[in-house]
A protein has these predicted regions:
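C-terminal binding/interaction regions
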Residues: 2-18, 71-76, 80-121
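Intrinsically disordered, low-complexity, basic-enriched segments
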Residues: 7-10, 29, 37-38
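Short glycine-/aliphatic-rich beta-strand segments at the starts of folded cytosolic domains
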Residues: 30-31, 39-57
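Short, conserved charged micro-motifs
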Residues: 39, 62-64, 94-99
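Short amphipathic alpha-helix segments
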Residues: 57-72
Length: 121
């Protein structure tokens, strides 16, 4: 491995660089059921029944996701960041689950995004 351009001649350790590679994917789709008031205060939302979080690449996809989510269920979009792809929504547990499921499905079927499974805590 000493001949590899990815190892250091002195230590033999792997050296690499992590780069952002654009792709179309939903990295995270998670529902926090009945979040504690301290968590809600930390992220700047009122105490909802549920908190839905998504991370989407490219980041502009979060705008589309927010549109789909609000049309799919009675949720409030609390935060959208088109640069990082973060989307945060609140609402009743069933509404947030419905919104996240519909959003992941729409991004997959309409735009060809690689989906993430819906997770819960």
């Amino acid at each position: 491995m000493a001949d590899s351009p990815f190892t250091s001649e002195q230590s033999g350790n792997f050296r690499g660089t992590l780069e952002y590679v654009p792709g179309k994917q939903v990295t995270l789709a998670h529902v926090i059921r009945n979040p504690r008031k301290s968590l809600c205060a930390a992220v700047g939302v009122d105490n909802p029944g549920a908190l839905g979080i998504m991370t989407i690449t490219p980041g502009e996809g979060s705008i589309i996701a927010a549109d789909v989510a609000t049309k799919a269920a009675a949720v409030n979009v609390e935060f959208v960041d088109r640069f990082t792809g973060c989307l945060m929504m609140t609402g009743e547990i069933s509404a947030v689950e419905t919104a996240l499921t519909a959003t992941v499905q729409a991004l997959k079927e309409i735009l060809g995004f690689f989906p993430a499974p819906l997770t819960h805590s």
